[in-house]
Amino acid sequence: MKNHPYRDMTAAMVRTGILGFGGGPSVIPLIRHEAVNKYKWIDDDEFGEILAIANALPGPIATKMAAYLGFKLKGTLGAIVAILAHILPTCLAMVGLFAAVNVLSHSAIVAGMIGAVTPVIAVMLGIMAYEFGQKALKGFGWVTGILFFIIAFIGLQTLQINPGLVIIIFLAYGAFHFKLKDKITNKHSKDKGMSAS
Protein backbone atom coordinates (compact mmCIF):
# COMPACT_ATOMS: atom_id res chain seq x y z
CA MET A 1 0.00 0.00 0.00
CA LYS A 2 1.51 3.32 -1.11
CA ASN A 3 2.01 6.16 1.29
CA HIS A 4 0.35 9.44 0.24
CA PRO A 5 1.30 11.97 2.96
CA TYR A 6 -0.30 15.04 1.36
CA ARG A 7 -3.53 13.24 0.52
CA ASP A 8 -3.80 11.56 3.93
CA MET A 9 -2.86 14.74 5.78
CA THR A 10 -5.37 16.84 3.84
CA ALA A 11 -8.17 14.31 4.35
CA ALA A 12 -7.40 14.04 8.08
CA MET A 13 -7.31 17.80 8.62
CA VAL A 14 -10.51 18.36 6.63
CA ARG A 15 -12.28 15.75 8.76
CA THR A 16 -11.07 17.28 12.02
CA GLY A 17 -12.04 20.75 10.83
CA ILE A 18 -15.60 19.95 9.75
CA LEU A 19 -16.40 17.52 12.58
CA GLY A 20 -14.99 19.63 15.42
CA PHE A 21 -18.26 21.01 16.75
CA GLY A 22 -17.64 23.21 19.78
CA GLY A 23 -14.08 24.34 19.08
CA GLY A 24 -10.76 23.21 20.57
CA PRO A 25 -11.89 20.65 23.18
CA SER A 26 -13.91 18.69 20.62
CA VAL A 27 -11.19 18.81 17.94
CA ILE A 28 -8.38 17.47 20.15
CA PRO A 29 -9.69 13.86 20.34
CA LEU A 30 -10.41 13.94 16.60
CA ILE A 31 -6.83 14.99 15.81
CA ARG A 32 -5.56 12.32 18.19
CA HIS A 33 -7.64 9.67 16.43
CA GLU A 34 -6.26 10.67 13.02
CA ALA A 35 -2.62 11.25 14.01
CA VAL A 36 -2.13 8.50 16.61
CA ASN A 37 -4.68 5.76 15.96
CA LYS A 38 -5.39 5.88 12.23
CA TYR A 39 -2.23 7.07 10.47
CA LYS A 40 0.25 6.54 13.34
CA TRP A 41 2.22 9.68 12.48
CA ILE A 42 3.01 10.15 16.17
CA ASP A 43 2.52 8.19 19.40
CA ASP A 44 0.52 9.15 22.48
CA ASP A 45 3.55 10.54 24.31
CA GLU A 46 4.40 12.92 21.47
CA PHE A 47 0.74 13.89 21.14
CA GLY A 48 0.66 14.77 24.85
CA GLU A 49 3.77 16.92 24.46
CA ILE A 50 2.30 18.77 21.45
CA LEU A 51 -0.97 19.31 23.30
CA ALA A 52 0.85 20.76 26.32
CA ILE A 53 2.95 23.12 24.21
CA ALA A 54 -0.06 24.15 22.09
CA ASN A 55 -1.99 24.97 25.27
CA ALA A 56 0.87 27.08 26.57
CA LEU A 57 1.04 29.18 23.39
CA PRO A 58 -1.53 31.79 22.29
CA GLY A 59 -4.03 31.04 19.53
CA PRO A 60 -6.32 28.13 18.60
CA ILE A 61 -5.00 24.75 19.77
CA ALA A 62 -6.22 22.80 16.75
CA THR A 63 -4.50 25.09 14.24
CA LYS A 64 -1.18 24.81 16.07
CA MET A 65 -1.47 21.03 16.22
CA ALA A 66 -2.32 20.87 12.51
CA ALA A 67 0.75 23.02 11.77
CA TYR A 68 2.99 20.72 13.82
CA LEU A 69 1.72 17.56 12.13
CA GLY A 70 2.07 19.09 8.68
CA PHE A 71 5.60 20.28 9.43
CA LYS A 72 6.59 16.89 10.84
CA LEU A 73 5.32 15.09 7.73
CA LYS A 74 6.33 17.44 4.91
CA GLY A 75 8.13 20.48 6.32
CA THR A 76 6.97 24.08 5.86
CA LEU A 77 4.75 23.31 2.85
CA GLY A 78 3.16 20.48 4.81
CA ALA A 79 2.37 22.86 7.68
CA ILE A 80 0.70 25.31 5.28
CA VAL A 81 -1.34 22.54 3.62
CA ALA A 82 -2.42 21.10 6.98
CA ILE A 83 -3.54 24.49 8.33
CA LEU A 84 -5.47 25.35 5.15
CA ALA A 85 -7.10 21.91 5.03
CA HIS A 86 -8.16 22.30 8.65
CA ILE A 87 -9.60 25.83 8.49
CA LEU A 88 -10.73 26.39 4.87
CA PRO A 89 -13.80 24.10 4.76
CA THR A 90 -15.39 25.71 7.82
CA CYS A 91 -14.37 29.23 6.71
CA LEU A 92 -15.98 28.68 3.31
CA ALA A 93 -19.08 27.21 4.93
CA MET A 94 -19.29 30.19 7.27
CA VAL A 95 -19.05 32.65 4.39
CA GLY A 96 -21.63 30.68 2.43
CA LEU A 97 -24.06 30.60 5.33
CA PHE A 98 -23.40 34.14 6.53
CA ALA A 99 -26.72 35.40 5.23
CA ALA A 100 -28.54 32.79 7.30
CA VAL A 101 -26.53 33.14 10.52
CA ASN A 102 -29.22 35.04 12.41
CA VAL A 103 -31.84 32.46 11.49
CA LEU A 104 -29.58 29.48 12.23
CA SER A 105 -28.47 30.85 15.59
CA HIS A 106 -32.05 30.59 16.83
CA SER A 107 -32.87 27.40 14.93
CA ALA A 108 -34.24 24.49 16.97
CA ILE A 109 -32.63 22.10 14.47
CA VAL A 110 -29.13 23.54 14.98
CA ALA A 111 -29.63 23.62 18.76
CA GLY A 112 -30.75 19.99 18.61
CA MET A 113 -27.70 18.98 16.55
CA ILE A 114 -25.32 20.65 19.00
CA GLY A 115 -27.16 19.14 21.96
CA ALA A 116 -26.99 15.66 20.42
CA VAL A 117 -23.29 15.79 19.57
CA THR A 118 -22.22 17.20 22.99
CA PRO A 119 -22.43 13.82 24.84
CA VAL A 120 -20.29 12.20 22.12
CA ILE A 121 -17.65 14.92 22.54
CA ALA A 122 -17.78 14.46 26.32
CA VAL A 123 -17.18 10.70 25.95
CA MET A 124 -14.25 11.23 23.56
CA LEU A 125 -12.67 13.75 25.93
CA GLY A 126 -13.27 11.39 28.85
CA ILE A 127 -11.54 8.49 27.08
CA MET A 128 -8.59 10.69 26.17
CA ALA A 129 -8.37 12.06 29.73
CA TYR A 130 -8.45 8.50 31.15
CA GLU A 131 -5.65 7.31 28.85
CA PHE A 132 -3.49 10.36 29.62
CA GLY A 133 -4.23 9.88 33.32
CA GLN A 134 -2.97 6.30 33.14
CA LYS A 135 0.25 7.48 31.50
CA ALA A 136 0.71 10.19 34.14
CA LEU A 137 0.28 7.71 36.99
CA LYS A 138 2.67 5.29 35.32
CA GLY A 139 5.31 7.99 34.82
CA PHE A 140 5.21 9.61 38.27
CA GLY A 141 3.58 6.93 40.43
CA TRP A 142 0.14 6.97 42.07
CA VAL A 143 0.92 9.34 44.94
CA THR A 144 2.66 12.02 42.87
CA GLY A 145 0.23 11.60 39.97
CA ILE A 146 -2.88 12.06 42.13
CA LEU A 147 -1.23 14.99 43.93
CA PHE A 148 -0.60 16.63 40.54
CA PHE A 149 -4.23 16.07 39.52
CA ILE A 150 -5.42 17.78 42.70
CA ILE A 151 -2.99 20.71 42.36
CA ALA A 152 -3.91 21.19 38.69
CA PHE A 153 -7.64 21.04 39.47
CA ILE A 154 -7.34 23.61 42.27
CA GLY A 155 -5.18 25.89 40.13
CA LEU A 156 -7.44 25.74 37.08
CA GLN A 157 -10.90 25.45 38.60
CA THR A 158 -10.71 27.12 42.02
CA LEU A 159 -7.96 29.72 41.61
CA GLN A 160 -8.74 30.32 37.90
CA ILE A 161 -5.04 30.41 36.96
CA ASN A 162 -4.33 30.72 33.25
CA PRO A 163 -4.03 27.17 31.79
CA GLY A 164 -0.91 28.17 29.86
CA LEU A 165 0.85 29.19 33.07
CA VAL A 166 -0.16 25.94 34.83
CA ILE A 167 1.19 23.90 31.91
CA ILE A 168 4.49 25.83 31.86
CA ILE A 169 4.95 25.23 35.61
CA PHE A 170 4.27 21.51 35.26
CA LEU A 171 6.55 21.24 32.20
CA ALA A 172 9.35 22.91 34.15
CA TYR A 173 8.83 20.59 37.11
CA GLY A 174 8.71 17.53 34.84
CA ALA A 175 12.02 18.47 33.22
CA PHE A 176 13.62 19.07 36.64
CA HIS A 177 12.14 15.85 38.09
CA PHE A 178 13.42 13.53 35.37
CA LYS A 179 16.80 15.27 35.15
CA LEU A 180 17.25 14.79 38.89
CA LYS A 181 16.04 11.19 38.60
CA ASP A 182 18.59 10.47 35.84
CA LYS A 183 21.37 12.05 37.89
CA ILE A 184 20.51 9.92 40.94
CA THR A 185 20.26 6.75 38.79
CA ASN A 186 23.64 7.44 37.12
CA LYS A 187 25.29 8.13 40.47
CA HIS A 188 23.83 4.92 41.90
CA SER A 189 25.12 2.94 38.89
CA LYS A 190 28.61 4.45 39.25
CA ASP A 191 28.68 3.65 42.98
CA LYS A 192 27.67 0.05 42.26
CA GLY A 193 30.38 -0.22 39.58
CA MET A 194 33.05 1.11 41.95
CA SER A 195 32.02 -1.21 44.77
CA ALA A 196 32.02 -4.20 42.38
CA SER A 197 35.57 -3.41 41.22
Swiss-Prot record:
Annotated membrane topology: Multi-pass membrane protein
Main location: membrane
A single GO molecular function term of this UniProt record: chromate transmembrane transporter activity
Keywords recorded for this protein, A-Z: Cell membrane, Membrane, Transmembrane, Transmembrane helix, Transport
Transmembrane segment boundaries: 11-31, 50-70, 79-99, 108-128, 136-156, 158-178
Keyword Ubl conjugation belongs to the record: no
Subcellular localization(s) per the UniProt record: Cell membrane
The keyword Lipid metabolism belongs to this UniProt entry's keyword annotation: no
Cellular component per GO, a single term: plasma membrane
Family statement: Belongs to the chromate ion transporter (CHR) (TC 2.A.51) family.
Protein's name in the database: Uncharacterized transporter YwrB
